[in-house]
């Protein structure tokens, strides 16, 4: 599978799904039961596909395994880019390179890893085709059991590295498919990889939950002025910098959950909208933050962001008014110190657009959104849309518009309340202890999978209130997750391979765990959980 290129957003990604389906059809079970493989449309042109394969046993209870097959681009392989999908040749080339020059510390570790014979390089080898391979191995072994109890289903999806459109489209198609196939999906295992720079003790893990991600933005409209007369306007940059100071790396804004603390919010983009030099202060600036969550809801976070931005706006205007008054006294003139700011949510801005420009203005914005839709940069799409909305609504400053700049990834966690959750937890623990004994190793529980992943949408039904808030305050429709109201909900954990430096030139998987321990461990979970 690694030898089949599948970079996100490319025709190779689109062609991977049908290839994978053909590979699965080589398994004897599927030769006898070809209708137990489905290829379901996801998105794009050419159309990318989700691949679904079920091995049936007795009854309706079903355990789902899930992994993504898209990979990030290969440009960082540089001169070895042509070998990125050829693990054997790449290993030989990397060894030749790493033994020919002075190395950085991470390269010294990579050389030692490769010389040990336990690590295999290649784009997608770690993230995450080795996880998909483990799922296939478990599916095939399950199919070989003559008295199978329950059912085992494998999902292989595209687009995890960009917008999880594969998993989200699968989630929406699954209720009808599960009903047609007569399946009750009662639990799931995401197979994504984790990084471990040590001996694997952290990487050999069962993750009970995954981190959430939000990307709130603040679009600042000031009042421009000639640089020689700064107090005839209001500095948009001052307001933006005060927002930056209030939010950037502020540990008070860290989220907590299950005894763990998320990283603080951090700025991903800060800029104004001018393309050239002027001796005029910019009217509009923009800042966008990556904000990771463990427990706070999107609605609650949005209200907190609004409050923090409002306080920052007040401080900036107060400071500007004080300096305007001080300058006026220095030069013996009257000061303009009556500036007052306001906060608009994206939902409120959209209503202003409708009030000022009517349906025609909304249609012009829709045309712009269609023109921008081919971009893979959510911040570019969002800021251009908000910029147009501000113009259509004739918003004057000082005003700050807030909203969500990209797809919201919910944090999710396996509970312990329902009978199926408890049964799943018991199967996980029994299989964990057996794998530790069988392979003389350790497998630990971890609460939060730190990588943004499909796990946010796997077996998870979004909260209705949160969904409404997100939809109303996300300028670009393509970043609004509109789940099928019949979407299935079930407990999910992440158990996958481990390795080092995924997405990098030296991406590598620890093979003994990925190809020996992991498939056996996963099979043990399935066998115990599906037993009546």
Regions found by a protein language model. Give the residues of each.
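Acidic/His- and Gly-rich active-site-bordering loop/insert found
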Residues: 1-123, 145-150
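Short, conserved micro-motifs enriched in small and acidic residues
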Residues: 11, 120-133, 230-237, 512-516
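An extended, acidic, His-containing surface patch that forms the Zn2+-binding/catalytic region
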Residues: 16-17, 32-37, 325-532
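A glycine-centered beta->alpha junction motif in the catalytic cores
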Residues: 71, 218-225, 293-295, 492-507
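Acidic/histidine-rich catalytic neighborhood of metal-dependent amide-processing enzymes
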Residues: 115-209
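Short glycine/serine- and small hydrophobic-enriched flexible loop segments
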Residues: 136-144, 242-249, 523-527
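Short glycine/proline-enriched loop/turn "hinge" motifs that connect secondary-structure elements
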Residues: 146-147, 207-213, 277-283, 392-395, ...
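Midchain, well-structured core segments that form catalytic/ion-binding scaffolds
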Residues: 175-384
